Amino acid sequence: MVRVLLAGLPRSGTSWAAEALSHTSEVTYVDEPDGFRDAFAFRVMMQYGENPALTPNEVAPEYERLWAGAFAGGRPPSGPKARLAQRAYLSVETSVRQNARAGSGVAPALRIAQRLAQPPTADPNARHVLVKSVQCARSLDWIQQRFQPQIVILLRNPLNALASWRDLGFVGNPSERADLANEAQQRWGVSAPHAEAPRLAHQAFTFGALTESLLSTAEEHPEWIVVRHEVLCEDAPNRFRALAGQLGLTWTEHAETFVRDSDREGQGYATKRVAGEQPQRWRQRLSDDDVEVIRGVLAQFPRGSVSDC
């Protein structure tokens, strides 16, 4: 079995890349098992945070159950408890879930979801498993040590990613911001923007801190594959075919068709975009002031590649 973890930050092109690779031969695709759509992931986030920071030797049984199920094929759990948990989780508004993760009180339905939620389960037919995550930047070493997946890190120009973060209102959890601020100060001597700073400055800080975590961990693992979204866009069919080969996955006509068909207009969470337009898309979406705010924040981080990625 080939196990692959495709990791990146939100709006970095991970959905497009993962879907392309999911069309290679005999691949079971598990989409964000640690994300915001599942009751067990919510249970995990309530314990470890939205972006868990775990050292390799740290004991985290619930997080381990989540990833064990994901790398075994990631089937949704069956049984009455799991179904009730998911139903309870989805019965409340997104804002109610956000408030719970931020420590502002847990609604009764979410308490039920937490108590009854079950992790993903094995798929006995899974030959190769591809897992995509945008929440594991601070736990990659922990995941690597336990499950030994091949790891692909996808980076994107922060100006493009942050244009999407701004439009979609990302980074709304004050407890997560405080946690990242403490880590950035302790590890890199980088201070978070002051409370009255523009929202975009706080978004850029979160992007910088999480990207710094990705890159600093990747530097210790030369066997990991680091890919830039802009490079994939240059010649998507050939770039993805080469990436699949590096991972030991067999490229298929379905994969080729998906990549070519996705090269057209799209917006929001859709995976369709005109690939050649994406590297410079930020120029149409950000003002000069926006760019100055982003670059000013990212310039504080020690790796020049953070402001350049």
Summary of predicted features, one role per range:
Residues S15-A18, R37-A39, A137-L140, N160-S164, ...:
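Short catalytic/ligand-binding loop motif for oxyanion handling, primarily in non-cytosolic enzymes
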Residues E32-V129, S175-P193:
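PAPS-dependent sulfation machinery
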